[in-house]
Amino acid sequence: MEKVPEYHIKNLKITPLYDQSSVMIQLEDAAGRKDIDYDVTVTARTMWPLKTAGRTGRPCMVRIPHMRNWSPEDPFLYDVHIKMGNDSVESYFAMRKIEVKNDKNGIPRIFLNNKPYFQKGVLDQGYWPDGLYTPPCDEAMIYDIQKMKDLGFNMIRKHIKIEPQRWYYHCDRIGMLVWQDMVNGGREYKSWYVTWLATAMEGTHIRAKDTRLHLMGRQDPTGQKQFESEMKETIRRLYNHPSVVTWVIFNEGWGQFKTRKMTDIALAEDHTRLIDSASGWFDQGCGDIKSIHDYFFPLNITPEKRVTALTEFGGYSLQIPKHSMYEKDIYGYKIFKRKKISAERMKN
């Protein structure tokens, strides 16, 4: 709960315009009033403060001289202070650009700041041993992100979960790219179709349609509307975080429906990021990425106009004594008993 003036700032939207060395600021006041004046101050340790003025209902453009990029190697952030009447907010932004372009050989690649950038990431389901989905403290979130970076990863795919915004802040300042999943929802799906048959078909390149809603657990129109609403809310909530570079709409057919329509809706909300429309199995040919999940078969890739990404693989497990909550049960797509063999397989 926060005490605010009668007329106060409701929403702040910040969009970096990388190729223009500028940032666009859009401010919304709680009463929906247009043409209300506000002041903007942009600061950074490498420059003198930049001051300008804007009005609600109109984009406010701020040019950034001697612009410094944001990347995992150099996660540079600019601070911004905005004052409207008796209300003020502080935030930050970064100058970075994510897109798909062809490289010099005509192969579609993900570009970060106008250069091809290989993303090597982990799937993070956000579980904690004591709080389940609730992190115990700020330091625990920092530790996870920093440890992944120390191990050589530059991306985390946040899987079927929205974290507290503090987590995304740490990704912003530490320098960790984020692929953000939408929370799936829907009713219970048919495992024989969504899991077993889909896995068997993955290597055939036969495109299964997303119209069998009763098999995917998404036959309820109310649930479809709820998903659309929550997808929009997720994008709006996380829009200002520079670390977030990809929206993942559906995962492995769980509650999947109207994939092309949902992709168009997500693009209307945010055209500055990439979209992985269907991560694994039920690809509908839309979005920026052909997203492959391959746990069991030799990798078989066909040329695509989109980026081809191996977005799930591995799942190897080696139980370490006294480091498991359940000593008897262990999950993995391949279970190892000896550390040496496991290390060799991971290397290869």
Task: Mark where each language-model region is.
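Secreted/periplasmic carbohydrate-active enzymes, especially glycoside hydrolases
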Residues: M1-H170, I174-V178, V245-T246, I265-A268
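Substrate-binding/catalytic cleft of secreted carbohydrate-active enzymes
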Residues: I145, M155-N348
